[in-house]
Amino acid sequence: MAAAPRGIWEQRRLGCGLGPLARLLILAQALRLLPAARAGLCPAPCACRLPLLDCSRRKLPAPSWRALSGPLPSDISSLDLSHNRLSNWNNTLESQTLQEVKMNYNELTEIPYFGEPTPNITLLSLVHNLIPEINAEAFELYSALESLDLSSNIISEIKTSSFPRMSLKYLNLSNNRISTLEAGCFDNLSDSLLVVKLNRNRISMIPPKVFKLPHLQFLELKRNRIKIVEGLTFQGLDSLRSLKMQRNGISKLKDGAFFGLNNMEELELEHNNLTGVNKGWLYGLRMLQQLYMSQNAIEKISPDAWEFCQRLSELDLSYNQLTRLDESAFVGLSLLERLNLGDNRVTHIADGVFRFLSNLQTLDLRNNDISWAIEDASEAFSGLKSLTKLILQGNRIKSVTQKAFIGLESLEYLDLNNNAIMSIQENAFSQTHLKGLVLNTSSLLCDCHLKWLLQWLVDNNFHHSVNVSCAHPEWLAGQSILNVDLKDFVCDDFLKPQIRTHPESTIALRGVNVTLTCTAVSSSDSPMSTIWRKDSEILYDVDIENFVRYRQQDGEALEYTSVLRLFSVNFTDEGKYQCIVTNHFGSNYSQKAKLTVNEMPSFLKTPMDLTIRTGAMARLECAAEGHPTPQISWQKDGGTDFPAARERRMHVMPEDDVFFIANVKIEDMGIYSCMAQNIAGGLSANASLTVLETPSFIRPLEDKTVTRGETAVLQCIAGGSPAPRLNWTKDDGPLLVTERHFFAAANQLLIIVDAGLEDAGKYTCLMSNTLGTERGHIYLNVISSPNCDSSQSSIGHEDDGWTTVGIVIIVVVCCVVGTSLIWVIVIYHMRRKNEDYSITNTEELNLPADIPSYLSSQGTLSEPQEGYSNSEAGSHQQLMPPANGYTHRGTDGGAGTRVICSDCYDNANIYSRTREYCPYTYIAEEDVLDQALSSLMVQMPKETFLSHPPQDAANLESLIPSAEREPAAFPTNHERMTENLPFSQRSSEIFQRPLWNMNRELGLLPFSQQPVLESPELTERDPNCSSPVTCRRLHDHAFDFSRTRIIQDGTEGT
């Protein structure tokens, strides 16, 4: 039998002097070790503590370890050879159960080999040795290895060949000299690796996608030399849950630095040099729950920083350089439960900054400078309805107002330690449910306002946990408030400053000077000082004047006045201003005065005059600046009634400062005004929109059939912009104008009095403007009597000519004489009145570049000149300049050129003695054609006029029988009008009309029936005539002029 282990014999020897119970325990231990002793497998240098074979700290020479070469106890699964100064290992072990080997704190330079147990080993710890590299061959025999700890060696790099393919789960390479990580160095471990520790190395850069470890859950890179983390650095770590990068000196995290870490819950970045928090580097961290960033240099939190990590439950930003918490600092963190902002430099907390933290339970604001949040009753903590713990120690708080903790209904623990609190208003803690209060101050002002605190501390059982004593009045100085009698809390004076004059809110224009005044009084001689704040931030380098004087108010009082002067205010000066008056006994805060800086609007873009075709898109630009930003609105012709708006053709693009009118129509033409308005004032800019339209027929052209001797009225109602010029031709040739031909409404009506057979034929109405020309045909059929057959005329019409039909109507001699007299009166009146008829003045018309002018060979409009001008059809117009100090008015209301001889004399001799005055004007926007025609009829030489009863002015439609006024298809030529109806059939219908319908069509006006003879001076020399032939003038006559009133009004309207 093998000898028993030395330990067992020693226990037996020591047990001889022990009691029965001790000997029994020793015997049990000996029996437990007996199987191992019997097997002879526990070597002398080691201790068997099943399942551990502890051979650590023996410090034996190498030959002493040969005893381990034999079989090991069967129950041994762990072997510890740490702290033995082993430099190599050449011994092979015999064990089927060995799984863990520790050889820490030795001097090994290579990976040891243990012989038979090596393939079964799952844990190998070689901490603090001298291994310089990782050799894949050494690990090929460790087929079952799951945990490898090589920390504190001298490994300098990890190569792609460092590890063989193995099922390693835990790898610790911390505290080495690793500076290089080759791409793909961990690829052979990608199927199993869960934990990697690379702390305390010399890694300065992490190559992108170096960690292709889809199962890795924990990665530590603490205490390296990483300064910049590039985007996509950690891509491939799909399962990572925790990343620790403390103490690296990281100064920049680029956008997408942690992209791909979709399952990460914990990120530790303490003790680095980060200066801000923004959503760029937080992108992709949607499952993040804990973020630790203390001990950095963070100065700012971007408004949308937490957009991609809204599951945060704990955020540590302590020991940074935050000076302000803006309103949007914590937007999106509705699940946050713990927030640590301690040991920063916070002096400004925006109103409502915590309103998004509805689930916050712990808020640590220790060692900042936010005394005003408690003293100014700003309700800075509103919205924290779940907060249970609030730490405010070390914030220089001097007073606690009644509204300081409004909104903290769930607050249970409040720490106000290390604040020299002097006053606490009554009911300051009434909104809370405090169970713990930490308060330590010896600066209390024990006056009547503090009497309530004593009883409140006792009632809530806080008198044992607080240390509060009085500093004033002097006879109570140093006494605990718990020992002061209630009758000693009196108010004999007002030591703390009291604000008497608050600064007032002001609205000022940009560039003016603004003055804000604040006045406080105190009964103490303690010096007072004032600081001004803008939006809760202290103002430096501003112009402040302070005045102090004594005044009598319930005794002597010190009055302190502070004046803040702001010169040439700008928009950056807008905000809420407040003065804070402080003396030895505390501070008082004035009301906040709002300064608003306005600026009158000024145009950046003004609309330009625009000329455009119908159907196109009109685009008017208008933009203005001012403060506040002016509102842009549009008017048309001084009103807001837009035809385009009613028809949903108007579009306003606020972002582009553009006003669109789609599918422009004639009714859109006018003056458009861009109005820029804000509370400081308004201004407007005008632009003229001119709409160009090709000539068109407003009413369809209709053929005419009249009885010989009747009056024929041919209508050519034209539309277009600018208003088109009209010319008439007959049978594709010039129209020979006689004393029976009259033109009205700018040649839109051709009136033939006492129609004869020679007047029958094809009349062409040719209208043209700057955009084009349009023509239409009217066929006039003159029949000899209403009962005559018109078949012959039909045949002549088909040959494109007119055949004289009918017989000469014998007119009574008296009617002929009457007709002659009326004709003389008409000529006399027209010459005397010398009505102003003009062509539309196109001098100032702005045309698109693609429209050449028909008045000038150079493509531009020609200046109107004195003399004669030829139209496109070959007719003539005599253009007269202003004379006798009078200016002729055009259709647009401005000055225009007077037309003496119009196109009615096509191809005629313009110097002929038979040349007659022919009115020429354009129709205005109102349709005055009906009125103009009725007025003009009084000038027609027809003896039957004298016997017609007086009547009012008739409309133009009265000249046309009702059957002819029916709307018809718009005819462009005569062939279209007569395509389906033979001329013989139509002529037969026309011939049925009685001869006396002429009077019914004319609709005559009343006039004087006294005969008027032509004066001998009617014919005289006209100096403006270019021909030596005498020109005929019309002079005034003595009969009733009321008959011409309608046509005069119509002329002025054009």
UniProtKB/Swiss-Prot annotation:
Q: Where are the LRR repeats?
A: 75-96, 97-118, 120-141, 144-165, 167-188, 192-213, 215-236, 239-260, 263-284, 287-308, 311-332, 335-356, 359-381, 386-407, 410-431
Extent of the signal sequence? 1-39
Q: Which domain of life is it from?
A: Eukaryota
Q: What coarse category fits the chief subcellular location reported for this protein?
A: membrane
Q: Name one Pfam family in it.
A: LRRCT
What Gene Ontology molecular function terms does this protein carry?
A: signaling receptor binding
Cite the Gene3D superfamilies for this sequence. Answer: Immunoglobulins, Ribonuclease Inhibitor
One annotated GO biological process = protein localization to cell surface
Q: Mind telling me what this protein is named?
A: Leucine-rich repeats and immunoglobulin-like domains protein 2
